[in-house]
């Protein structure tokens, strides 16, 4: 799931499945990846992402559950790195093991050998900044699997009616203004803006922010996949997804195949809907349907919708804007 941080030129990637359908320009914006677990359908895209990372200056952080550092080391060790010293690549890998986060960094200058970093305590939050925080919960899929919640600190938008009444022509300046507001940098710098009557007006960033910027509580996205429907899993997933604006949740099986879902440590569509309802999620996006339901996808969505009692949507093939 590619999550775009709107107006930031940055994004977050949840899981590393097949990435061939995602444009490279989008993947190059990714700054953090959370891999829920390393079954092939969630980790096969690691090499694709690594290849794109080699020539870029920005550090990429990849987080996974216990045992993840060994999996990453195995992937990287499969290649020969004798010509890598001049590449700027910096890949930080970290795993959540109990109450500890263990990390290493791979650098081109270090010929992609893992360099240990200091351990830090695991508090449930793996990243926090002015724009958003990333929360994870360790769930059970027969192996540890991570549930993820991305929580925007504050949502910044534009009052389009006010913009129109001021006769201002929308443009790149709007993105720059929102970016400045998020970072508390909307000061006295002047901006010249074209008007709809072919004129021009001059404002400071602070004046514009006061006139057209709207502030509201931040949006919440939760991502839960590959878990068994047990009391402990449900309690943890519900808390993680509490009041989410959108819960992206696996619906691998129809409830008629609940025994099979339980045997394979997956959710049914009905269970996904029940989980979303218990969490108070505003919308539910079921995904990760078993291939056995090819041609019956609508049945899966309908079952989830009935249990949820709220809006159910289908994501695009790759992304969610935030």
Name the predicted role of every residue range:
Residues 14-16, 31-41, 65, 222-228, ...:
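Active-site neighborhood of phospho(di)ester-bond hydrolases with catalytic His/Asp-centered motifs
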Residues 1-27, 32, 59, 148-150, ...:
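Conserved beta-strand hairpin/beta-sheet module of binuclear metal-dependent hydrolase folds
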Residues 90-104, 211-215, 231-322:
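Binuclear metal-ion centers of metallo-dependent hydrolases, dominated by the metallo-beta-lactamase
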Residues 18-64:
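Active-site metal-binding motif and surrounding structural segment of the metallo-beta-lactamase
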Residues 30, 55-60, 218-219, 279-286:
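Short, surface-exposed connector motifs at secondary-structure boundaries
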Residues 59, 71-119, 292:
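Active-site neighborhood of divalent metal-dependent phosphoester bond hydrolases
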Residues 48-52, 80-81, 294-303:
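Metal-dependent catalytic neighborhoods of phosphoester/phosphodiester hydrolases
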Residues 103-234, 239, 246:
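Active-site-proximal loop/helix segment associated with metal-binding centers of metalloenzymes
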């Amino acid at each position: 799931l590619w999550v775009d941080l709107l107006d930031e030129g940055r994004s977050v990637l949840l899981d590393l499945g097949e990435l061939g359908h995602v444009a490279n320009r989008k993947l190059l914006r990714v700054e953090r990846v959370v891999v829920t677990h390393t079954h092939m359908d969630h980790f096969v895209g690691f090499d694709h992402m690594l290849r794109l990372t080699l020539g870029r200056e920005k550090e990429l952080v990849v987080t996974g559950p216990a045992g993840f550092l060994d999996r990453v080391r195995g992937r990287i060790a499969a290649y020969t790195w004798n010509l890598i010293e001049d590449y700027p690549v910096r890949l930080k890998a970290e795993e959540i093991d109990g109450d500890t986060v263990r990390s290493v960094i791979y650098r081109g200058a270090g010929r992609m050998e893992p360099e240990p970093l200091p351990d830090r305590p695991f508090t449930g939050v793996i990243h926090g900044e002015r724009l958003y925080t990333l929360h994870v919960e360790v769930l059970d899929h027969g192996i540890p699997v991570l549930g993820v919640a991305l929580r925007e600190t504050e949502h910044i938008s534009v009052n389009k009616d006010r913009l129109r009444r001021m006769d201002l022509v929308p443009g790149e300046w709007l993105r720059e203004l929102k970016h400045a507001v998020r970072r508390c940098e909307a000061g006295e710098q002047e901006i010249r803006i074209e008007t709809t009557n072919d004129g021009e007006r001059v404002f400071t960033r602070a004046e514009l922010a006061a006139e057209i910027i709207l502030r509201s509580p931040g949006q919440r996205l939760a991502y839960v996949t590959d878990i068994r429907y047990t009391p402990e899993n449900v309690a943890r997933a519900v808390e993680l997804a509490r009041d989410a604006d959108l819960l992206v949740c696996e619906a691998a099986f129809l409830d008629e195949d609940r025994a099979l879902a339980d045997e394979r440590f997956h959710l049914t569509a009905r269970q996904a809907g029940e989980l979303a309802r218990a969490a108070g999620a505003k919308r539910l996006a079921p995904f990760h349907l078993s291939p056995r339901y090819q041609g019956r996808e609508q049945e899966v969505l309908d079952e989830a919708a009935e249990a949820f009692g709220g809006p159910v949507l289908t994501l695009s093939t790759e992304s969610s804007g935030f």
